[in-house]
Amino acid sequence: MSSQNLNRRDFLKLAGISYGGLLFGNRLDSYLKSSSPQMDEFMPDAEIAITAKEKWVQILSGSQTRVWGYEGQLLSGSGVTVQNLPGNYLGPIIRVKTGMKLRIYFHNELAEDSVIHPHGPRVPEASDGHPMQAIGPGQMKVYEFEIIDRAGPYWFHPHPHMRTAEQVVMGMAGLLSVWDDEEELAVPGASTGLNDIPVIIQDRNFDSTNQFLYNPNNMWGYLGNRILVNGKPNTVFALEPRAYRFRILNGSNARTYKLAWSNNMPMQVIGTDGGLLPAVASRPYVMLMPGERIDIWADFTALARKQVILRSLSFDPMGGMMGGGGGGMGGSGGMGGGGMGGGGMMGSGLPMGSAFDILTVSVGRRAGTKPVLGPLAPLSVIYKAEDFATARPFTLDMSMMTWTINGRVFEMMEVAEDEMVHVHDTMAWEWINNTPIPHPMHMHNVQFQVVQRTVPATSSYATINQGLVDTGWKDTAPVWPGERVKIAMTFGPHAGMYMYHCHILEHEDMTMMRNYMIMDHTMPPMPM
């Protein structure tokens, strides 16, 4: 842990003083120290090593591709599996049960700083992967946390300051699959993943030698012209004529997908970011923005010896707000930025909102066991819009080609007064999208429920509105142009400084990210 503490001290020395209702650096240090766990009291059930390193893998025919990836190893303990994916840049897949305590040793063998963010689960501040916790080449960071959340399709990825987007493009992402007894009763094989089909959808650009080409634009971020599933192109799953569970992650930096089956069978949604829904949500298609996960129950019983394609359908990503409605473009009068027309069509051979195939399911003749979906349990808490007459507003905007939240940009050690909450506070926040493009808004260390959408009066919204699934727990929510999205949540049990941001990774790196502080009675008094 010495590298982590040194990092924190170095950041605090460089932080300086902030003004205008913000926490001063030395007082913020007190908050961070008081929120850190006592590591000598932690007794893990399992210890895992994760190493970030460069390697070469075969993605396209011809030359291999240089990638960065994680490699995992189970060092001690039982009840946890760590599955590496040979010949792939993705992974590992870590499968663990709710209630288990993990100690993870993160080794950085890259030539630049990095840090891992566990995306979805609530963890102590010291293990959340804030950019200030990044470690340098050759260093190690220790993560210690208990899985306190319900079963869900969580994941992990890098989160260094201004380098998250390119590190993810280079290949760094893994799955943290959490199961519990409730899920095991509802979904056959939940504890083992017997019926699971993990699907990580990404898009990439390649140069003439098959190397990843990172060429984002300022508006849309990085849009690739090749679709990869689980790190490979042209994916075909050979499956039996029975039901399977498709656990889909949008692992792209910026691209939104409108998922549908080619035979028009409905998308049967059984879960979202934070686990199972209280009831199956049937949709003609499902919208999936970067960072979001969706859990689909797909029954191929009637499709023996046939093929069905999972596609992304066309949609209008612009919201009818080319001028940035409400000043969202800072008076720039159009998209600007060079090659950023509607859907980024000049910056990518596959514009945002265009239609394309993602993967093919080739159904065989016979099935062995035929799993049957059990009853889904009700949520332990249901928030309702009428219980939250007021909400803290957070306006998403753009000024002079800089993305902002409430007019602010990211500062490493800055927390404003309206970004302070207390452990066990239950409240609503409202995202207000004043920009011409959609944003997937992600919060660290909390699962929330979308309780209200105030929709814009634009024809483009009709191209996506049937694909929203708001009936479960979320950590990332789509906010369409001109839309207001009210979310409700209870903070805790961990106190400390966490983050919220747009999960278009280029937007995050370009300052569309802020800190928020969860305070408790053990912390020093708030600065006046």
Model region roles, listed by residue range:
Residues 1-10:
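N-terminal secretory signal peptides
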Residues 393-403, 410-450, 475-495, 501:
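C-terminal substrate/ligand-recognition segments
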Residues 288, 298, 417-421:
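Extracellular/surface-associated beta-sandwich interaction domains
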Residues 146-150, 299-305, 490-495:
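Short, surface-exposed loop/turn segments at beta-strand-coil junctions that are enriched for proline
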